C-alpha cells in the first residue's frame, strides 16, 4: 500500500497503536513500513508491506479486520495524514535471502510476457551473481495479482543504503 504522507510520526504512532491492540496482535500478518526515496515519478513517500503466510492467512486477516474497531480507528488516523497512491497485491514467485533483515531496497517494476522464461533467466543471473559474491543479501521476483501498472516487480535488498549501492555497483547496474 503506497501513500504520500504529510506527517510520518503520526503514521508510525497510528500503526504502533493498532499493532498493540488485540486485533493487531491476533491477525495473521506482518507489516513493514518503508520510507520511499529516489523513486522517480512516483508520488508516494511511504509504503506498507503487509505479508501473509498464504491465501488462508489473507482470508483470516480480512475476516479479523472487518470486525475490528481498532482497525477502523487506524484507517481514520491514517487518512488524516496521508493520501493513497497505490494498492497492489503480489505473490512471491522467487525469493532468496531474508528481506526482513534488509533496510534498503532497489525495486524494479516490470511487465513480463512469459513468466517461466523470465524466472529461468533471472535465476541464472542471480545464481551467477551469488557465486561471484556480487549478490549477498535478499532478492526476488513477485507477481502482481491485483494492480494494473505492471505485472511483476523484482527487488534487491541491502543491509543499508551503502550496502545496496555497493551491490548495484558490483552488478554493473549503474
What are these regions (language model features)?
Residues 1-174:
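Short S/T/G/P-rich N-terminal loop/turn motif that feeds into the first structured element of a domain
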Amino acid at each position: 500500500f503506497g501513500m504520500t504522507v504529510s506527517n510520518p510520526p503520526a503514521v508510525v504512532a497510528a500503526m504502533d497503536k493498532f499493532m498493540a491492540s488485540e486485533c493487531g496482535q491476533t491477525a495473521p500478518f506482518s507489516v513493514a513500513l518503508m520510507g520511499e526515496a529516489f523513486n522517480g515519478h512516483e508520488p508516494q513517500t511511504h509504503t506498507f508491506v503487509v505479508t501473509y503466510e498464504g491465501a488462508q492467512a489473507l482470508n483470516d486477516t480480512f475476516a479479523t479486520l472487518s470486525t475490528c474497531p481498532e482497525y477502523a480507528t487506524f484507517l481514520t488516523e491514517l487518512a488524516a495524514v496521508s493520501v493513497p497512491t497505490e494498492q497492489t497485491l503480489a505473490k512471491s514467485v522467487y525469493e532468496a535471502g531474508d528481506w526482513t533483515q534488509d533496510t534498503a531496497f532497489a525495486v524494479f517494476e516490470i511487465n513480463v510476457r512469459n513468466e517461466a522464461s523470465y524466472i529461468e533467466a533471472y535465476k541464472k543471473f542471480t545464481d551467477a551473481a551469488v557465486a561471484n559474491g556480487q549478490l549477498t543479501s535478499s532478492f526476488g521476483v513477485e507477481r502482481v495479482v491485483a494492480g494494473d501498472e505492471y505485472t511483476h516487480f523484482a527487488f534487491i535488498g541491502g543491509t543499508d543504503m551503502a550496502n545496496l549501492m555497493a551491490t548495484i555497483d558490483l552488478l554493473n547496474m549503474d
